Amino acid sequence: VGLPNKINNDILLDIIRQNKIPIISPLGLDKNNQTHNINGDTAAMAVAKSVKSRRLLLMTNVDGVLNKEKKLIDEISSSEILEMVKDETITEGMIPKINACLDAVNNGVTAAGIINGTKQHSCLWEIFSDKGSGTLIRK
């Protein structure tokens, strides 16, 4: 598994200027042209930072970040997230998503959302409604 260190913004922005949506595979090449798999959340975060996105959305099969009572947290700050990781409220598969979101919001992305990709219209609700559909993470 590799980590991204450079994103080719020119290609991405050219596709976006054509009113198309770029589809990005989380694969990367090293200096020896060896192919490496990159965690999809990490790749999405790197792209969001590189193109200076306002929002990063990561999808999962749960509604978002849950508190100790397993209730959805609508919005949370970076410091609150770190406390939840420390006290092990957030564990396992959510950790890479949380790390990607924190990296994004600490490096120029205004907010990051973790939403349930199995729910119909979750992206639209997250983007176009006041309440959203998952957890919004801000700096």
Model-based region annotation:
Residues V1-K139:
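C-terminal catalytic "cap/lid" subdomain
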